[in-house]
Amino acid sequence: MVWLLFLSSFCFADEVVEIRISGNKRVSETTVRGLLHVEVGQDVASDELNAVFKRLTASRLFSSVELDLTAGILEVKLQENPILRNVVVKGNKLLSRAAIDKILVYKKDAIFDVHEFENSITALKSYYRDSVVEKTAISYRIVPIDENNVDVEVTVKEAKPTVIRAIEFEGNTTYSDRVLKHVIRSREKSILRLFGTAHYYSREKLEFDKDLLADFYQGKGYFDYALEGLEERENEDGVVLVFKLKEGARYSFGRVSVVSEKGEIEISDLKEKVRIREGAVFNIGAVRENALTLLSVLNERGHMFVNVVPEYHPDANGRVDLTYHVVSTKKYRIRKINISGNTRTKDTVIRREMLLSENDLYQPSKVADSRRRILNLGFFDEVYIEEHKIDGQNLILEVRVKERPTGTLNLSGGYGSDVGFFGNFSFVENNLFGTSDRLVVELQKASLGSNYSMEFQRKRIFDTFITAGASVFYKNRNEKANGLYKFSSVGGDGSVSYSLRDDLRLHLGYSLSFDKIFDVEGDAPESVKSSAGTKILSAVSYSLFLNKLDNYFVPRYGYGVRFGNKFAGIGGDVKFLRSDFKAGGFVSVFDQSAVLSLIVRAGNIFGYSGQGVDVANRFFLNEMRGFDNLGIGPRDVETDDALGGNFFILGTAEVQVPMRLPVELDLKAAFFYEVGTLTGVDVTTEKVYDSHALRSSVGAGLVWNSPFGVLRVDVAKALVEGKGDKVKTVKFGIVSPF
């Protein structure tokens, strides 16, 4: 409530002979006088008094302001805004309190601004309407505690979520409804989806769906694709979504050229950087990737405020000529970065992955790199960053994300090729409390051993690029199934990692464990018997990871290289130097529907100071499909026991393609070829057969992106075997990120 009483002299200035201030209790009189900008003896007209009124209300210290200038006496009557003690939210079930608090603007134990709070209530209503459930009623009431303190009670009456009963497509002649349902994120209600929310109607989700359909069609040559309409047929049972499409004709790439409006930019060699072949099927993804490649090259050459803009020239023969224009960009300043869709993940987790901040100058290349960094967190299915110009010098960045589950609670049992029958309990949360902290607790009991471990990792320590983690573990393994020994290990490790640059990360670690080999069979090889007993392993390690992948968890293109060394002997009984290497490349094939990967892994270990490498620290190439666990590598001639090796190399070529099954199953078929070997034993007193020959295998498998992680089963046949090798047709396993 605000008042401005008209002056006794409306058009002429009155001299102020006295100033009387009342109603201020917490706010000092000095503060009020500082806002007045009026002194005794000063002539004040109506427009000046109006300015006083505006300053007092703009301070947001007062809920009511009354001014009266009569007979030279300026009376300032104030009513202060109360102090907010607490905000209570009731009735919210579909949206967490943490997510609501991100939208509501308030600060406890601070001055309560009712107008600002009302605006945030409006924002909360909009968020519910677009992202959670429509027709949600939200109200609030102010509960006075005493004269100067209030509580606020927010009541949310969530409507029943609108269920998507069916999804239909019109105008699609090339791709079936089943294929297109795989493309979008909205899902039909199904018995396979009892507990999720993907089948709930959401405007925000539909916006993602529109973008995904456009990327899908234009990624497969349909340059003229358009979504002509989206019909929502609602009834008491839910809603039927009808996407009305215009597929258009299929185009291929024509001529590709690069031109520049800036004469000082050298572009003669830029066309060589474009990896688009004339005659290839038009692909909007390839257009964007090559634009980013050109932009990156230009940035490296010092041209920071340029952009690469594709221009299309379709012809009647189904070809699209493509021209990349190198243009000067006006220097826009980022006034605000808005983030939406993150109902669980804290804004700070996303903002710290942004290479641009508010008040920075806008750079398109940094926007693209920021999107990749956010995706690599592993918390989101989709990330879109759009810019909206607000005037000729400023813009707003809108970051829209679609969150994915980041935690699992698993109680399961089954059979694994490397552990036998097992029972497993695990809790994994990769985004603990929305902070990006990682917590893993795992308890596994198997016929061939047990594994108990707990790991905690915190990213961005002190808001830097440093990640720190620690773990403790106990594991034991019964190798008696192979006629050898029992093994147990208890210990822990600590690690820190640091980003040397955006795509290069350094990892440093220390581990300490007490390893025991016991219950050795009497006819076991002498090298195994000599390893018996308890030894202390104290080791430091480092690794470097060059990450040029589009997505660390599910890569579709790009490459990655990882190598490192582990040095044991910083105290303890065991002395060795171990080296590990992994490199892989990924590319989308078959019109972007499948992914071809080539991966090479290698490792080498050797002892020093007169020590050899114990059997517990050697490599066992159990990952090679077509061969049994302990199936290849050096073997004891007399007992046929596997001894492990000091060197291995394994190369894998694989293609994964989506299967024509219900989208809920999320199954892919994999076809692969592998070649590798395991060799080298430096501690042995017995006769050993050690073939250096390369083995190879070929096979196929099923890959399931399950709630418990990416699982797979493979059927493989060994093509080339070594003497004494053990083959196995079927293997089960869990897929780890690159």
Curated annotation (Swiss-Prot):
Key word Transmembrane present: yes
GO CC, one annotated term: cell outer membrane
Domain POTRA: start-end pairs: 14-81, 82-159, 162-248, 251-329, 332-404
GO biological process: Gram-negative-bacterium-type cell outer membrane assembly; protein insertion into membrane
Signal peptide residues on this chain, from the entry's feature table: 1-13
Keywords: Cell outer membrane, Membrane, Repeat, Signal, Transmembrane, Transmembrane beta strand
Record bears the keyword Heme: no
Subcellular location: Cell outer membrane
Primary localisation category: membrane
Subunit-level organization: Part of the Bam complex.
NCBIfam families reported in the protein's UniProt record: OM_YaeT (TIGR03303)
Family named by the database record: Belongs to the BamA family.
Described purpose of this protein according to its UniProt entry: Part of the outer membrane protein assembly complex, which is involved in assembly and insertion of beta-barrel proteins into the outer membrane.
The protein, known as: Outer membrane protein assembly factor BamA
Gene: bamA
